[in-house]
Amino acid sequence: MPEVFIGKKPLTNYVMAVVMQFMQGANEVVIKARGRNISRAVDVAERVRKRFLAGQVDVGDIKIDSEEVVDPATGQKRTVSTIEIKLVKK
């Protein structure tokens, strides 16, 4: 199952990556993000669902979680929230 990891690039790059996966025959695409990029992942999913592939794609599943990461600067453990949004072809 194809996955798109959301980072700091423009939203359009991620939207087009998801659309391309569906155009290449994928039935499901998972959008993943951590921390501050969670809201960007939701924006990508909604743009794909309502603008680019309106009526063709639906949200299949949403998973939220948190994971511990070690801050490289301080060496301390931090908890970072994560999200996975599965888009499914209708």
Swiss-Prot record:
State its location(s).
Cytoplasm; Chromosome
SUPFAM superfamilies in the cross-refs: AlbA-like (SSF82704)
Q: Which residues carry this modification: N6-acetyllysine?
A: K8
Q: What is this protein called?
A: DNA/RNA-binding protein Alba
Cellular component per GO, a single term? chromosome
Free-text description of this protein's post-translational modifications in UniProt: Acetylated. Acetylation at Lys-8 decreases DNA-binding affinity.
Q: Which InterPro entries match?
A: Alba-like_dom_sf, DNA/RNA-bd_Alba, DNA/RNA-bd_Alba-like
